[in-house]
Amino acid sequence: IELGTFIGYSAVLISSTIEEKSKLTSIDSDSHSIEIAKELINFAGLDDKVNLMHGSAEEIIPELNFNADFVFIDHAKKKYLSDLKLLETQEIILKNCTVFADNVGIFKDEMAEYFDHVRNSGKYQSQNFSSKLEYRNNIYDAVEISIKN
């Protein structure tokens, strides 16, 4: 699952590396972004590996009827925690699911509650990885990678 499709860049990268039988469900609330992503994914020849869904995560998540082994969160930073909790309560993420939260370094001030949940709730084993922001040598960002217990 990808929360935040934008133009499909991450969807192309993720779907090009997943197993043959796997599929990425990518959710975005912006219809224009979905249209651009659809073109990019099609151009990459990966349209059979990506299911694009238009709507907010809080609308779409309750409709999902599968378990995810990987979740990439890269949408509105204030929604990271609430959407993660929704995935938990809907039992979409179970033991050993990897949750990859992007851009938590440059938005760290908005991430305190998210960090507290994945680091201290006992539900996850979590680690933060810092690196230079893509295409910017002077700005650092981070990702938080959490494995569901």
Predicted segments — roles?
Residues 81-149:
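C-terminal substrate-binding/active-site "lid" region of AdoMet-derived donor-dependent transferases
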Residues 14, 37, 61, 83-87, ...:
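Hydrophobic packing residues within well-ordered alpha-helices of enzyme cores
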Residues 1-58:
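SAM cofactor-binding core of SAM-dependent methyltransferases
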Residues 19, 45-47, 65, 94, ...:
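Short, well-ordered coil/turn elements that cap or connect secondary structure elements
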Residues 49-107:
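Active-site segment flanking the S-adenosylmethionine/decSAM binding pocket
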Residues 8, 34, 60-62, 80, ...:
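Conserved protein kinase catalytic core
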